[in-house]
Amino acid sequence: MAGPASVAGDVFVDALPYFDQGYDATGVREAAAALVEEETRRYRPTKNYLSYLPTPDFSAFETEIMRNEFERLAARQPMELLSMKRYELPAPSSGQKNDMTAWQDCVNNSMAQLEHQAVRIENLELMAQYGTNAWKMSNDNLALMIENSQKELQNVRKEIQDLNWQRKNDQLAGGAKLRELESNWVSLVSKNYEIERAIVQLENEVAQMKQQQGDENKENIRQDF
């Protein structure tokens, strides 16, 4: 249950869930849900609250390759197989057997393929030499990150628990104070009722005494005459 909002926009909550009773009573949850539903029906938005924003452009970050791939998927076409042509070493065709340029292109292609394989071998050797330690260091870094995250998580959980305990203590103290004030209010109301009843009784007695005195005065006057 929330009170009125302040100037700063904060909402003052006057519910004491750690102290209040009756939340689990039959029909309470249904009644609360009915109140929420009734309020949402009365305050449904009457216009598009995003109307001040421009129309979203979902293709703003699409590239030509992405668009082609989307079109392929929409057409349910299979993906093109990976071309292995650049790894082939074809000899010049029968019509180019005497063409030096064709043979030079074949030699250049062979040299490129050889260099590519040499680079692959170097990478494998480097991985064999340093890969194990690099992998161990990466695992150690991940373990350290996990440990730090676990510590941070424990700290956050402790802060949440401390906050909940503080909230519970404050609510129980506030509830006890409210109960004391309620008891004092009931006592004061009872005393006021007793005082009012005594006043009414005294007023009745005074009225009776006045009436009796008036009757006696009338009787004395009548006897004098």
From Swiss-Prot:
Its main location: nucleus. Pfam families: BCAS2 (PF05700). Keywords: Coiled coil, mRNA processing, mRNA splicing, Nucleus, Spliceosome. It is found in: Nucleus. InterPro entries: SPF27. GO terms for cellular component: catalytic step 2 spliceosome; nucleus; Prp19 complex; U2-type catalytic step 2 spliceosome. It comes from the Eukaryota. The keyword Ribonucleoprotein does not apply. One of its GO terms (biological process) is mRNA splicing, via spliceosome. Belongs to the SPF27 family. Component of the pre-catalytic and catalytic spliceosome complexes. Component of the postcatalytic spliceosome P complex. This is Pre-mRNA-splicing factor SPF27. It comes from Danio rerio (Zebrafish). The gene is bcas2.
